[in-house]
């Protein structure tokens, strides 16, 4: 075991490849023992490692004069040490009310936004924070008690991407006691935040009542938790990679605001990959800004939702995210405004773009296409009244079906094809000038259509449905 605080931190930094020489480091300094000790450690290494140090401090304005005194303390300390100091005062309570989040999440968002800004300003490679080994123990315990994702159970990361560089925590290998001793040896008198002793917070209760018992069993318990954290992170990285690979085969459609997947294909995945797959979708749609009210319980709800016997249904998630099941497909997307009825003429030849970005393209030809799948409609040119009209469905719509006597309700065709209700309103209905429904793209052709087998030399009107979507990957 190393005798000194500095040597222990040196070993930890080297073991985990925390930071490189000749780098600019933004150090988050609250004025408390942890961040002040981190600052002094980095200053001790500054000359040898050719570090550029910038201190950043946020006054969250939670504690009135006390928090303002913290800011002044940091400014005075930096002046004494000859270090660049960037500070800001943010009314976090106002921000919290404005965006409807708890105080801790609001403070974190404001603080990290400021750190990112300072990182950009000085072209820094790292943001260093003062979390230590006891923090790691408390964090893992708290997440186990409250529930979290597998990534969350791994606790605090030593190093993770942040802006164009990394957020690092060099002190995770030492305890709070060692930090306090280091401050005493340097005759530093840091600021003390009284809220750290309030038992209203889960973390503080764990610190006061649980952590001492763990340290009685093993004084180096923080090292065991740190090892557990690293193993969890390594395992999680591997499972995330597998989940990416599998989900890219499960997803059937993808856009910026919506993802659809095949439920049978999804359920063929193992449960660990299913949970991570749902998390990947949520990360993508929320753009990695997951609402604080979202938890592992929501992921379990989605998995249970897929197992229900009912063929359709929906779930509402925070931030207006809606999850809609329609038979064997499920769509994740943000609630959209009601689709307005539409009507548009389509010339021949010509092209129109639909509201979803897909296109209908018409042509006149004496030859029929070699590929006569559901994306193509062919009729004799003179059998159709022009112009063609593309519209939304209407009550009572019917069409004569190729190879069938009489007519059939459009509604029945949608139901048989298991088209979700919300998609029916935006589905294009192709009519001729007399109002006859001649084609429901991708679903049914009318009696006006000809087949490849019955086609002879003639003049044909051909419509192609061209989708902008391919099988979507959730990896950008």
From Swiss-Prot:
A cellular component annotation (GO) from this entry: cytoplasm
One Pfam family, short name: TilS_C
The keyword Signal is assigned to this record: no
Domain of life according to the entry: Bacteria
SUPFAM superfamilies, per the entry: Adenine nucleotide alpha hydrolases-like, MesJ substrate recognition domain-like, PheT/TilS domain
Keywords: ATP-binding, Cytoplasm, Ligase, Nucleotide-binding, tRNA processing
InterPro entries attached to this UniProt entry: Lysidine-tRNA-synth_C, Rossmann-like_a/b/a_fold, TilS/TtcA_N, tRNA_Ile_lys_synt, tRNA_Ile_lys_synt_N, tRNA_Ile_lys_synt_subst-bd
Residues reported in the UniProt entry to bind ATP: 30-35
Molecular function GO terms recorded: ATP binding; tRNA(Ile)-lysidine synthase activity
Enzyme nomenclature, EC number: 6.3.4.19
Location in or out of the cell: Cytoplasm
Predominant cellular place of this UniProt entry's protein: cytoplasm
Reactions catalysed, as given in the entry: cytidine(34) in tRNA(Ile2) + L-lysine + ATP = lysidine(34) in tRNA(Ile2) + AMP + diphosphate + H(+)
One GO term of the biological process aspect: tRNA modification
Domain remark text: The N-terminal region contains the highly conserved SGGXDS motif, predicted to be a P-loop motif involved in ATP binding.
Stated family: Belongs to the tRNA(Ile)-lysidine synthase family.
Biological role: Ligates lysine onto the cytidine present at position 34 of the AUA codon-specific tRNA(Ile) that contains the anticodon CAU, in an ATP-dependent manner. Cytidine is converted to lysidine, thus changing the amino acid specificity of the tRNA from methionine to isoleucine.
Cross-referenced PANTHER family: TRNA(ILE)-LYSIDINE SYNTHASE-RELATED
Name listed for the protein in its UniProt record: tRNA(Ile)-lysidine synthase
Organism: Bacillus cereus (strain ATCC 10987 / NRS 248)
């Amino acid at each position: 075991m190393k005798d000194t605080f500095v040597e222990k931190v040196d070993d930890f930094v080297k073991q985990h490849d925390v930071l490189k020489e000749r780098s600019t480091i933004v150090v988050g300094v609250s004025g408390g023992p942890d961040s002040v000790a981190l600052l002094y450690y980095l200053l001790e290494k500054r000359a040898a490692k050719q570090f550029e140090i910038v201190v950043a401090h946020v006054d969250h304005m939670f504690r009135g004069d006390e928090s303002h005194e913290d800011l002044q303390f940091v400014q005075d300390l930096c002046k004494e040490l000859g270090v660049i100091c960037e500070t800001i005062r943010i009314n976090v309570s106002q921000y919290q009310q404005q965006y409807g989040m708890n105080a801790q999440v609001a403070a974190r968002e404001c603080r990290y936004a400021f750190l990112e800004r300072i990182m950009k300003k000085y072209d820094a490679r790292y943001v260093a924070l003062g979390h230590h080994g006891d923090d790691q123990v408390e964090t893992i315990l708290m997440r186990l008690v409250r529930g979290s994702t597998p990534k969350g159970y791994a606790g605090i990361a030593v190093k993770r991407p942040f802006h164009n560089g990394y957020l690092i925590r060099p002190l995770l290998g030492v305890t709070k006691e060692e930090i306090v001793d280091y401050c005493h040896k340097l005759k530093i008198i840091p600021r003390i935040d009284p809220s750290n002793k309030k038992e209203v917070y889960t973390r503080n209760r764990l610190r006061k009542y649980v952590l001492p018992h763990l340290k009685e069993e093993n004084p180096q318990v923080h090292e065991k938790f740190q090892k557990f954290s690293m193993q969890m992170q390594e395992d999680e990285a591997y499972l995330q990679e597998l989940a990416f690979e599998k989900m890219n085969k499960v997803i059937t459609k993808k856009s910026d605001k919506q993802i659809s997947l095949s439920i049978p294909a999804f359920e063929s995945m193992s449960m660990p990959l299913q949970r991570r797959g749902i998390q990947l979708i949520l990360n993508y749609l929320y753009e990695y800004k997951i609402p604080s009210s979202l938890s592992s319980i929501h992921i379990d709800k989605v998995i249970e939702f897929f197992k229900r016997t009912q063929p359709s249904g929906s779930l509402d998630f925070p931030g207006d995210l809606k999850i809609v099941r329609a038979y064997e497909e499920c769509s994740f997307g943000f609630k959209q405004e009601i689709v307005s009825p539409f009507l548009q003429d389509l010339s021949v030849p010509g092209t129109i773009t639909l509201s979803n970005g897909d296109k209908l393209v018409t042509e006149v030809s004496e030859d029929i296409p070699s590929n006569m799948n559901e994306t193509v409609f062919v009729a004799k040119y003179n059998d159709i009244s022009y112009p063609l009209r593309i519209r939304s469905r209407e009550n009572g719509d019917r069409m004569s079906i190729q190879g069938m006597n009489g007519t059939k309700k459009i509604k029945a065709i949608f139901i048989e094809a298991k088209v979700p209700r919300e998609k029916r309103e935006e589905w294009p209905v192709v009519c001729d000038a007399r109002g006859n429904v001649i084609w429901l793209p991708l679903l049914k052709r009318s009696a006006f259509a000809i087949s490849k087998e019955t086609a002879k030399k003639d003049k044909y009107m051909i419509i192609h449905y061209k989708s902008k979507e391919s099988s979507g990957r959730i990896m950008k």
